[in-house]
Regions:
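Cysteine-centered loop/knuckle micro-motif
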Residues: 37
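N-terminal [4Fe-4S]-dependent radical SAM core
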Residues: 1-30, 40-80
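Glycine-rich phosphate-binding P-loop
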Residues: 34
């Protein structure tokens, strides 16, 4: 497993998704390595092959600091932000780096009034319930592939 700390140039990305105006991806790559993941195309942006998906994660260590600057540019209260479109914001490394929590803290500190969406398959998401309670419009989506470990491991080798 390759883990690399990087400094990103930006963190709040304009989205072309129908239900999100912006996305925040605190990591490049995803340790879960799900065989069905559409985000595996991101491998090419860090010089990897699609088959390497799940074997590397690049950690955007400056994500909360970047968001602190970038969130001030959003004036519209009807804006939606999605965590995350091409990674799982609560994969295992989040326990160490706390980048997703840091970014959500920035939103609460700045009294963000828009909609926040979170997509994950990790139980770690419950760690941040205290912050979720401070956001007026938040949705958390959880993926549960199967209740049988053998089936889950087939599709999600590291989940």
């Amino acid at each position: 497993m390759e883990i690399k700390e990087i400094k990103a140039k930006s963190i709040l990305t304009k989205s072309m998704l129908p239900d999100a105006d912006y996305v925040i991806n605190p990591y490049i790559g995803c340790r879960f390595g799900c065989v069905y993941c559409y985000a595996s195309f991101m491998s090419k942006y860090v010089g990897k092959e699609i088959k390497d998906w799940g074997d590397f994660v690049y950690v955007k260590i400056n994500a909360p600091k970047l968001l602190e600057k970038e969130i001030k540019k959003i004036r519209d209260k009807n804006v939606s932000i999605l965590f995350s479109s091409v990674t799982d914001p609560y994969q295992g490394l989040e326990a160490k780096y706390k980048l997703t929590r840091g970014c959500i803290q920035v939103l609460t500190d700045n009294n963000f009034q828009g909609r926040v969406g979170i997509l994950t398959k990790s139980h770690m998401v419950i760690r941040d319930i205290d912050l979720f309670k401070q956001i007026k419009n938040i949705e958390v989506g959880l993926t549960i592939t199967s209740t049988e470990d053998q089936i889950s491991r087939f599709f999600e080798r590291n989940a």
